[in-house]
A protein has these predicted regions:
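Short coil/loop linkers at secondary-structure junctions
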Residues: 1, 25-26, 156, 189
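Residue-level preference for alpha-helix termini and adjacent loops
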Residues: 3, 49, 204-205
Length: 213
């Protein structure tokens, strides 16, 4: 339903060849770089997992996050080639799902996958609403961009639905408070939504509420 894909493991060279044969320009695309000795383009996969497209308001992919199969120091990494020859830095954007011009209300949370799952779980229910997912807590610069874009399409209210662990984690609480302040200062009605810590993220909450949908 979400159409996610796993990171390629065996066809990396063929993928690059097919893209070049189609006339795609890989210079400037995060994740691709050029080998100095051979001049060949390479796709830099640094860990296996699920690829999550980070989509802007127009539905265009600006970055790709990878949710790792095996978690070490972090669950996610951005597909990037910044430290390689002719490589490119990955820069995430506010991720939009189910947000359209004319919508008056959107929900704000953290994460591409969390936004996609929550929106998917709530579809067809009275709680169906578009989501904006910020890639990380805090992500103030992304939120500033989101506020400008949401204002441009007529959104009036933002439901702030960060993880319920803001009740015990100071960093998350401070970010939540700041999101509320920034949204109000930008002229939005801001509605902080709280639920029991048993369901950490809004995706967990919606999965519980709509599991029989």
């Amino acid at each position: 339903r979400l159409c996610y894909r796993t990171t390629p493991t065996t066809r990396l060279k063929r993928i690059v060849t097919e893209l070049l044969e189609r006339g795609c320009i890989l210079d400037g695309v995060p994740g691709f770089y050029c080998q100095k000795d051979s001049g060949q383009w390479v796709l830099d996969i640094r860990g296996s997992g699920i690829m999550l497209p980070d989509r802007n308001l127009l539905g265009q992919i600006e970055a790709i996050q990878v949710r790792l199969d095996k978690v070490y120091n972090q669950k996610f990494y951005n597909l990037t080639s910044v430290d390689q020859y002719y490589g490119t830095q990955s820069k995430c954007c506010p991720h939009y799902v189910g947000v359209h011009e004319g919508d008056e209300v959107v929900c704000l949370t953290e994460g591409v996958m969390k936004s996609d799952l929550a929106y998917s779980f709530a579809q067809g229910s009275p709680y169906e609403c578009g989501f904006v997912g910020l890639t990380g807590i805090p992500s103030y610069s992304q939120y500033e961009r989101a506020l400008e874009e949401l204002d441009s399409i007529g959104v009036k209210r933002i439901n702030v639905m960060v993880d319920s662990d803001y009740q015990v984690k100071e960093e998350v609480r401070k970010a939540r408070d700041r999101y509320i302040e920034m949204g109000a200062a930008a002229g939005f009605e801001v509605a902080p939504i709280t639920w029991a810590q048993k369901r950490k993220g809004v995706d967990d909450l919606y999965k519980h509420l709509f599991r029989n949908k």
